[in-house]
């Protein structure tokens, strides 16, 4: 079981991003891309994700579709039930032409904000833009839930 690790205390105005991926290298890469702009926490499996959700409400979760102990779609549902304002971006190492379209559609239907492929088109600007858009939506969701 991978441990949950929290980043430094969130600074005012920084969004809280939770990276959930069983590949340490992918978590390291995403942290490197995002840590200058966001408060980053990490989880390496489904159990660590559940533990993380007990301690904090992330604004955005980057969630791998395939974890050793959990299905990404099931985790998506758990996240949205626990923290409805949180936006979830699904991650997959599967090529986009290998049947990923069907589970991508299921993820969007289940409340996912978006999808990032961990393939060759994976780029820093794409990750930053997707997370920024998801954070804006999460903040709007929070305001709506608070009645404002």
Question: Model-predicted segments: where are they?
Answer:
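Non-catalytic signal-transmission and effector/linker regions of two-component phosphorelay proteins
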Residues: 1-18, 125-148
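Two-component/phosphorelay signaling modules centered on CheY-like receiver
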Residues: 24-41
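Acidic catalytic/metal-coordinating carboxylates
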Residues: 45, 71-74
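Residue-level signal for the "D+5" position in two-component response regulator receiver
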Residues: 42, 67-70
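Acidic, metal-coordinating helix/loop segments flanking the phosphotransfer/catalytic sites
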Residues: 42-60
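Short amphipathic alpha-helix used as the core "switch/output" element in two-component signaling
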Residues: 51, 73-85, 106
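Alpha4 helix (beta4-alpha4-beta5 surface) of REC/receiver domains from two-component response regulators
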Residues: 74, 95-129
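Active-site residues of response regulator receiver
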Residues: 64, 92
